[in-house]
Regions:
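Bulky hydrophobic segments
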Residues: 1-115, 119, 131-173
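Active-site metal-coordination segments of metallo-dependent hydrolases
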Residues: 121-123
């Protein structure tokens, strides 16, 4: 847990050093911001991309299980590092996602034409949401976890015409 906290704080410091705004430039911090085409998108604690971060956690749990349990990489006690690996991956993504290259890519190929990157508090919250997804995958049966991921993708896809699957496809191709 301490390593995960340290990684998260390092990501926050890097994002601040990259001149990302600490909070929404509107001056408020909202629990939910639902308009993906506004300047407040990806600036608050949760938004329509929160399900994607929860799904990241579920996928990272599966990756940790595969590496540490199924393949036995790292020995008997390696599985305890699953959450640390997940936080490191999510923190790395949050830093990469806020580089000019990725911000410009999002603007050019996704539905987020006005995307300007995340506020630091949003990135911090995204790491928290990913950790929640990891915890869900740890505690719930596999089929329930998969069902929740599919539901999250379908709802976000239907409501805002965007989700993790579409973002990956549009960013890569």
């Amino acid at each position: 847990i301490l390593a995960s906290i340290g990684i998260t704080l390092l990501a926050v410091m890097i994002l601040l050093a990259m001149d990302r705004p600490p909070i929404c430039t509107c001056g408020t911090v909202n629990l939910w911001h639902g308009d993906i085409n506004s300047s407040g998108n990806s600036q608050h604690l949760s938004d329509w991309y929160t399900p994607s971060h929860i799904i990241h956690g579920m996928l990272f749990y599966a990756l940790g299980w595969l590496l540490f349990v199924r393949l036995g990489i790292g020995g008997r006690n390696a599985a305890k590092w699953g959450i640390t690996l997940a936080v490191a991956l999510e923190a790395a993504w949050e830093v990469i996602e806020n580089t000019p290259f990725v911000i410009d890519r999002y603007r050019s190929v996704t539905v987020n034409w006005g995307y300007s990157g995340d506020s630091v508090i949003n990135s911090f919250a995204d790491i928290g949401w990913m950790s929640f997804g990891f915890w869900l995958a740890l505690r719930l049966p596999v089929r329930v976890t998969v069902a929740l991921a599919v539901i999250g993708e379908l709802v976000a896809g239907y409501v805002v015409r965007d989700n993790l699957t579409l973002n990956v496809i549009m960013l890569v191709y």
